[in-house]
């Protein structure tokens, strides 16, 4: 809802970066279920944790939004988890997907990383 140019968010669910991170985490989870069994508990487990960490750190940081520096710290953790997820996806793509079929989701994570970076800058410069 917009009132006089300000955006009011009732919950972290209203944040575009959270919504995108949540959607991508679900896709990564489903993707890992198609990996060979020996990868389910190693590479698969690691990427499931890193992809879910993105959304979870956004949510936890939003819960501390009253404390700007805490909020920023959790958003930075989220961005770092996004980078980790991209690294994991690249490894899985190179090992298990010779057709480079994960390039699309890798690009979506790059977009999420850019959006997180812009949101971090917004919070740093505009959050009261």
Annotate each language-model stretch with its function.
Residues 1-128:
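Amphipathic alpha-helical assembly/interaction segments
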